[in-house]
């Protein structure tokens, strides 16, 4: 039968951290359910980039990225990924961003963040009572500003029900591999990591000391 792709939306914005969104984009777009048929098959994930407007965004480091959709034209999503970066400092307080995230949170099977993207989710009150994490430099801020969030400091990514938050920047790769595992099992996730020549994380613990 035809492969029913999961529709993944990655929120992109000015001053986004490049690897925050490119890491998960890479993982989910190179996934194959059957590694031996890689050349002849597509990913089970259809990854789309969503921004506030249809204008190109400029990342940290000045890469220009063209979104597939704006908030208004965004289709129904199965998975939402909210990355981080300097841009979140402003965006986490913007009503249209919070409204979009709240709306999508109701329809998705899986709500996820990378790095400081979790601060947007936290300010939308989506992480109240939820075990969550963020970039190591923002853990203290998360604790101080969002008293209802159960801040986790020792895991590389944290899964609580249908919400997954990850640590900083490169952690989005491991978090995305975990999404693959969650949907298609460990063997598919390992094969995806191997294809990327990326070490598959066996134990979910923070990779750096801070």
Could you describe each region identified by the protein language model?
Residues 5-7, 131, 162:
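Residues that mark the start of a beta-strand
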Residues 118, 164-177:
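Active-site-proximal catalytic alpha-helix in oxidoreductases
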Residues 111-112, 132:
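A short beta-strand/loop micro-motif in the catalytic core of glycosyltransferases
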Residues 154-165:
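Amphipathic alpha-helical segments enriched in hydrophobic/aromatic residues interleaved with Lys/Arg
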Residues 1-111, 120-123, 140-145, 151-154, ...:
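Extended, subdomain-level signal for the structured scaffold at the beginning of enzyme domains
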């Amino acid at each position: 039968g035809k492969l029913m792709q999961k529709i993944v939306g990655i929120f992109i914005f000015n001053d986004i951290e490049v690897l925050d969104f490119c890491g998960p984009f890479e993982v989910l777009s190179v996934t194959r359910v059957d590694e031996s048929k890689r050349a002849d098959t597509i990913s089970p994930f259809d990854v789309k980039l969503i921004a506030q407007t249809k204008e190109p965004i400029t990342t940290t480091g000045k890469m220009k990225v063209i979104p597939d959709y704006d908030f208004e034209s965004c289709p129904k999503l199965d998975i939402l990924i909210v990355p981080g970066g300097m841009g979140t400092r402003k965006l986490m307080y913007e009503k249209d961003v919070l409204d979009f995230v709240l709306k999508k949170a109701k329809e998705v099977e899986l709500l996820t963040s990378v790095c400081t993207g979790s601060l947007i989710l936290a300010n939308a009150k989506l992480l109240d009572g939820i075990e969550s994490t963020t970039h190591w430099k923002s853990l203290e801020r998360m604790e101080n500003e969002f008293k209802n969030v159960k801040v986790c400091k020792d895991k590389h990514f944290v899964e609580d029900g249908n919400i997954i938050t990850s640590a900083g920047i490169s952690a989005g790769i491991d978090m995305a591999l975990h999404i693959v595992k969650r949907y298609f099992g460990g063997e598919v996730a390992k094969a995806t990591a191997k294809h990327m020549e990326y070490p598959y994380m066996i134990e979910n613990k923070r990779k750096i000391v801070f």
